[in-house]
């Protein structure tokens, strides 16, 4: 019975949706799941179907990181320790769904989805303006 359970888990895709994130125009968008998980050898950050970062363990057990030439490469950072993605100088066009696809050695895949909305100003700035502006 245990063998059957293990066989059924191979190749399973798990997905998780995170709360919507709001970022100010011109600011930074920070996306991540927090901690590095063991057993994973391939990571892809995507914006829709566009790959932003591809990180994969090499045969020498080194993490190889690639930034495809697609407009994000000069303003994005990948944290190889926690697998987080930071996008700088956010624009309205950066609003949408970002996904972190992680693949483990046994073929199991995990996907974390993040919806991002880029706004004209931060909520903090808006509240400051609203509180000091005359009616």
Curated annotation (Swiss-Prot):
InterPro entries: Ig-like_dom_sf, Ig-like_fold, Ig_sub, Ig_V-set. It comes from the Viruses. PANTHER family: CD48 ANTIGEN-RELATED, LFA-3. This is Uncharacterized protein ORF11. It comes from Fowl adenovirus A serotype 1 (strain CELO / Phelps).
């Amino acid at each position: 019975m245990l063998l059957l359970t293990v066989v059924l888990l191979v190749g399973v895709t798990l997905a998780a949706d995170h709360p919507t994130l709001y970022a100010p125009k011109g600011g930074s968008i920070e996306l991540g799941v927090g901690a590095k998980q063991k057993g994973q050898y391939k990571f892809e950050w995507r914006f829709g179907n566009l790959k932003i970062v591809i990180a994969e363990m090499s045969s020498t057990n080194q993490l190889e990181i690639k930034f495809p030439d697609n407009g994000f490469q000069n303003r994005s950072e990948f944290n190889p320790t926690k697998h987080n993605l930071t996008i700088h100088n956010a624009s309205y066009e950066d609003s949408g769904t970002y996904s972190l696809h992680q693949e483990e050695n046994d073929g199991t895949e995990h996907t974390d989805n993040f919806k991002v909305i880029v706004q004209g100003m931060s909520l903090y700035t808006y509240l400051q303006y609203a509180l000091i502006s005359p009616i």
